[in-house]
A protein has these predicted regions:
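Conserved small/polar residues in nucleotide/adenosyl-binding loops
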Residues: 1-6
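Cleavable N-terminal signal peptides
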Residues: 7-8, 18
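Sec/Tat signal peptide C-region and signal peptidase I cleavage site
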Residues: 13-20
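N-terminal secretory/targeting leader peptides
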Residues: 21-121, 137-140, 144-361
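Hinge/lid segment of periplasmic solute-binding proteins
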Residues: 126-141
């Protein structure tokens, strides 16, 4: 809820009036700041830059209440919190909103994509321009405007025990956020739905023996490596899955010059976040090797061979088309065109999918 306090500074005999307003904005995310690049840069880049520029370039002031780590809305509540105005600006993973934002998850539905977050982010931005219905649905259905996109570094699997062939994961309970669970369930693993804040306990209590996650989280503040020290670089890909939105009612109440600053700084924020996310990926892998050695594990980080990657992709090759059909059926959007456009644009970057998924037709 955007709150405004106004004072009128009159010049002459009411001939003109200048309004100096103080706006209060609630900004937040369900994830914590330190271990996640998209929230960390929200706190360190977006918020301070908005404050500084509004103070320096306008007659207004902005007071920002920051609410990370679910203080106002948990990971699966942020979209609704922005919709209702509980948060004026929110950042969240569309992976937790498959019932409402299934089409936004299209890169999840084309696994073994690029492992570079900055590349995937750039390609996904191209797709957003080609398919404006994606951003429009946020405005038409959920009272919020898309202002930025970030994401997570290359997904792999952390496990309690070492393994070599993909077939060894059959029958093993593996945790994931939700829409990416078929990556392993279709291969024979037992899927367990969880979120970043609860995954550690799920591993610690034996609910699962593995987790689909990204290195920066596995080695970083979430410390999943303590329970699952063996990391396998699978090559599922980096995913531009997190977005930032602003409540439309809030946006309408803001002076144009303030709104302009927010939109501009949102662009700076997303660039900083994806760059940081990619850097965290490299650091995460390095840290996992070091942490493994401290435990006496010399093979803490290993790589899935390309032949195994192709076997994996072949096993799940019909799933992307199934998801495309769901997008078309339930959202009135051409899911096949959307996902084929994504693969086309990704291949223009030089990426080669182990299996070129057949979608549509």
């Amino acid at each position: 809820m955007c709150i405004r306090d106004s004072s009128i500074l009159a010049t002459g005999i009411m001939a003109s009036a200048s309004f100096a307003d103080t706006f209060t904005l609630r900004v937040g995310s369900g994830h914590p700041s330190k271990p996640t690049a998209y929230v960390g840069n929200m706190e360190k880049v977006l918020v301070p830059n908005i404050k500084k520029r509004v103070a320096a370039e306008t007659n207004h002031k902005v007071r920002i209440i920051e609410a990370y780590a679910g203080k106002i809305a948990k990971v699966h509540e942020t979209l609704e919190a922005v919709e209702k105005g509980l948060l004026d600006i929110g950042s969240y993973c569309v992976c937790f909103e498959t019932a409402k934002l299934l089409p936004w998850n299209f890169d999840y539905f084309v696994p073994f994509t690029t492992t570079n977050l900055e590349t995937n982010w750039a390609v996904k931005h191209k797709i957003l321009k080609q398919f404006p219905a994606l951003t429009k649905m946020l405005e038409d259905k959920y009272n919020q405007k898309f202002i930025a996109m970030q994401g997570f570094d290359d997904y792999g699997i952390g496990t309690v025990k070492q393994w070599q062939k993909a077939s060894e994961l059959k029958g093993v309970k593996v945790i994931a956020a939700g829409p990416n669970l078929p990556w392993v369930s279709l291969f024979g693993s037992i899927p367990v739905t969880s979120t970043l804040p609860t995954m550690y306990n799920d591993l610690a209590t034996g609910v699962a023996k593995g987790v689909i996650i990204f290195p920066s989280a596995h080695a970083g503040g979430f410390k999943f490596y303590e329970q699952a020290p063996y990391w396998k670089v699978i090559g599922f890909g980096a995913m531009a899955q997190t977005i930032t939105t602003i409540n439309l009612d809030t946006l309408k109440k803001l002076p144009p010059e303030v709104a302009k600053i927010i939109m501009e700084e949102a662009k700076n924020y997303e660039k900083a976040a994806v760059k940081d996310g990619q850097q965290r990926y490299q650091k995460g892998l390095t840290d996992l090797v070091k942490l493994g050695k401290k435990k006496g594990i010399n093979d803490a980080v290993t790589y899935l061979p390309l032949d195994q990657q192709k076997i994996w992709a072949e096993t799940i090759k019909d799933w992307p088309n199934s998801r495309a059909k769901d997008i078309t059926k339930d959202y009135g959007m051409d899911g096949a065109a959307l996902m084929n456009a994504y693969m086309d644009e990704m291949e223009k970057t030089g990426h080669k999918f182990p299996v070129r998924y057949k979608i549509g037709g």
